Amino acid sequence: VQFYPAKQESMFCFSSGTSGLPKAVRLTHMNLIANTIQMTVTLGGRVNKPTYDLYGWYDQPAAPLLEGIDQVHYSLLPQFHCYGMITSIINLHTLTPAIIEAKFSPESFFRAVQKFRVTFAFVVPPILIALVRSPMADKYDLSSIKSLASGAAFLSKELCTICLLYTSP
């Protein structure tokens, strides 16, 4: 049996149906590797030492490892969805704890950020809209959030600008 990682299906996930009905999306092994590397670099190169550069995937000779638990991710994306699956793989790859919630509400998000000192959140634009419109935001300490990643749909420049006000450098 010959194996071609660039072309071989690793899994089928589902789209959100933004442009119609949800569709099965074919993800190859290389799709997963590329997405994991892309997001790991976005997160500052914090990677799991046992897998770091085992196959020469990164250009840098070394990357900083997690020093204690100073990073916590928040995700409520369905794990059967492409974006949700990739976020799970990223959390495993970077050894980052994740707060995973089955149901979203702005208050549950704010409560989790304050309680667990969430530093990063994987979200979609409709979630961001709900968060920035919520009057509850001012009742919680959200200072731990350093950055957000949005995907699966268009993110307007205006919404991006508002989100920058909620993230600390």
PLM segments and residue spans:
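Short beta-strand->loop structural element characteristic of the AMP-binding/adenylate-forming
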Residues: V1, K23-R26, S75, P97-K103
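Conserved G/P- and acidic residue-centered "switch" motifs that form tight phosphate/ATP-binding loops
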Residues: T18, L95, A152
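Conserved AMP-binding A3 loop
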Residues: F3, S10-V41, R46-L54
